[in-house]
Amino acid sequence: MVLNFKKIFILVFTVILLLGSLADFVSIGYAENTTDQEKKTDDVTVLQEKSDIKSLGLAPNEVVVANGKKGSDLLDFEAFIKPSDIVDGTEPFDKSNEAGNDSSPNNGIVRTFDTVTYPLKVTINPKKHDKLKDIKLKITGTLENGITNKRVNAKFAVGGKEDLEKGIVSFDMEYTLKETGNSLMIPVTVEVQGAEHGIKLKPNIKIQVMSVEGKDILNEQIEQSFENISPVTTSGKVNVKARINQSYSTLNFRLYRAYNPNAAESNRSNVFGNTITFYIANLPYRNDLRGATFPNGKINYHFEFSGRVTWDDKSLAETVLDFESEDTPIKIFNYGDIDTEAKKIPQENTESFELGIENYMQVNPHVAFTARSYIPKDKWNADDIEKYTINSVWDSGKTEISKPEVGKEKVVYKASVKDYVIGSTFPTMHAHTTNVPSFSKNQKAFSTVAFLIHTPNEYRSLGKNNQINKPNNVYYDLKCIVDSYEDSKGNVISYNTSTSTTITERNTVNGSYSLQNAFFTPDGKELGTPNLGYSTVSKGDATTIVGQDVKMHADLNVHAVTEGGAIIVYKWNTDSFYLTKEAGERAARDIISRGYTSLLGTTISNSDKQKVYYGIARKNDNSFQAITQNKEEDYEWYTTYDEARKYGEIAAIKNDIQDMFSHGTIIERGIFFKVKTRKVGSVNEKGTPNIIATAADIFPTADRKTRYRVAENRAYNNYTEYDENGVMTKLQSPVKSSVNFETLGIMNGETSSEVTTNKTTYYSSDNVNVTVDNLVKLPGEMDFTYLDEKIEMRVKIPKGLDYVVGTAKYGDQYIEPKIEQQSDGSNHLIWYDTLTRSNKVLKKINFETRINPVLLPQGNQVGLEIQNVLSSSMDTRLEKFRTSSKNISIVKIGMVGVSETIKKLQVKKIVIMKLGCSHIQL
């Protein structure tokens, strides 16, 4: 009996120590009294000692913010926000509370781009049952001053919605408590955006019990509201930047005549496209955006344009442009939004406006290396708003410029922008795509505008200022200086930041042309490491499986007016690739239909000035040296496929453009090959490399007396090499942009997979269901009689996710994985399968993981990545090609379940004492 008493005492003492070691609160046992006595003090509820809230970590008479119905005949319900638990800001903190600073996590001040967390603590205890299950809770709320002056100052991290037109910031989230016996902490987090300095943010929060065990109890109105939470004050310092991007609307330049139909045909002046972007960045000596914010009113800035000329003849000195003498001043032809509207209207004080041009058409006006200028207002509250926010600001506002001030070496335009709208999202991608980044995480763009700059081009061959006909380059320096901004009270705040760029008029052939090559699958999939933004770039690691066809992509990039046209030769190794008659004739049609760029920026297709020919190599030499360096004269050319085949296998196609063309890209996308070689690696059965290449001859003058060969002096070092097992040992050199050859590797098989989860956002109390769909591609002509290929499927689950033993299925069978623990806290789950004659397909993997809140990274909402890697002897590509991944988001919910444990111990004194202990923030 004494022994049993000692055991009970030790057990109870251990439980007390455990409770004392937790970090915020927990409810012990059931509420003794469901009728809480309370009194009011300044509209804030003060709960008396008999309230169960005392058992949740509050001292007697501590002020809490709560009102509403706290229970029913079915259950007792407590929810509160303890003021001292509210955390306004995150580490590290500053030494002062000046604009942009915050010295403490509980001083009522929060920096911009920081967070405020309101721990909403909930306890539910049954009255008539030992336990209740599946208690559905709904938490909603709004944020006072969440939107002011066309700006979203803050938003809710989970379930948030911002209505700019109505000026309302709100949130709506649901959570299901699996069973009573757990106390709950739900963090309601406000994410401060680029708020105005000194704004007071005040959330109003409501929590309601929706249903219990599937039964709707909304009519009982069991809810708590929090409408007297003390506001926090935002702290922000303006840090606006400007950025100039060239090549607006796919143009580096176009002839002025493309925009002014009244210009003389002899006018050879140019128009360059540029964009100006206003954004904010992190304050000096900080590595994130905390404390930085946007200006409140009009931004005043100005342009300074200048220019200089450098000559290829080094005996001629660099010339600075003189706009008061022999050089015509640079002008702003027009400016406007970056959008899909092709018809552009001249703006006041621009050259187009002064000339009385009514309108003009802009080709691809949405294409730019910055964000779009606005989201259509009818899409602001659309369910698919993410389609627009990824590459667009909300509203760039109104831009105005002055008339130009022309000086000797400088042209100045004063400008301003106002009435911009700042939402809760900021663009990351280019205006014309959703997969090419334009901004880093610390760059928040809010206004973009396109400018067309008119340059006189007076230093062209035999131009007004180049009668000596010497090759040269003209550099136009464009500088944008932010002078000041106006705050919300109309005060003008002086500012000084600048950005610049240089645009070039090339009056020399060298550097004006480049060639690109790449392999693709017949259906258009890029082979090799994807090159974001421009896929027709050599990678060196392109591969395909035995027997799979490929196609060749080749580009000639043009940055100059070319009066005599060009000859482009697309060539390949005939030991590795075969061009069928159907493919050859298709390629000719494709080349002619894609055409070339006119002086006005339009595409000329199906012209009688463009011819296609089929080439037979003069020498039977498929060496690396021969293919990379063969020129037009190294082939015999024929007008038809059938005629050429009489003399051998076709080894090249010639694209002969006998017409003037301008800036743009001459594209080839239609040369389809049968892959002849079956040998693994990059060398075929005859010992020559699997390569394609492109050569080009440029004719600067219409008489074609002068020929310039693109990349004529290029050094070709090596093609990509593989060992006998198909493992890459050396990457081709040169490689990447402006390289006119590409290597293809051959593999015996190709594996791939897709990782999916049952949701994308989870609470920390949830389980994550993971599915991995594994695929294998084998050669179509393969003899499967002796197929015996072992495949490893390795799923990498990060620290914070624990595999639930017994849940794993491979196909329809429960098969437990091999588990390897990693030093970084992650785990690898490994399955194996063997491909055979009767088993040529990999199966799906399905399993569950339990979220381990203790091991999650810091923060109320965190992201994790699940990866799957396939390994085999037949697919020896780099691991990145055999890896797939899935990202999930986890919202932390604090929870500890002690009531049930204490109840089983039947230690009544512990229950009556209603011990208060801290909750672990999970």
Swiss-Prot record:
It is a single-pass membrane protein. It is found in: Membrane. The keyword Membrane applies. Its main location: membrane. Keywords: Membrane, Plasmid, Transmembrane, Transmembrane helix. It comes from the Bacteria. The chain crosses the membrane at residues 9-31. GO terms for cellular component: membrane. This is Uncharacterized protein pXO2-29/pXO2-30/BXB0028/GBAA_pXO2_0028. It comes from Bacillus anthracis.
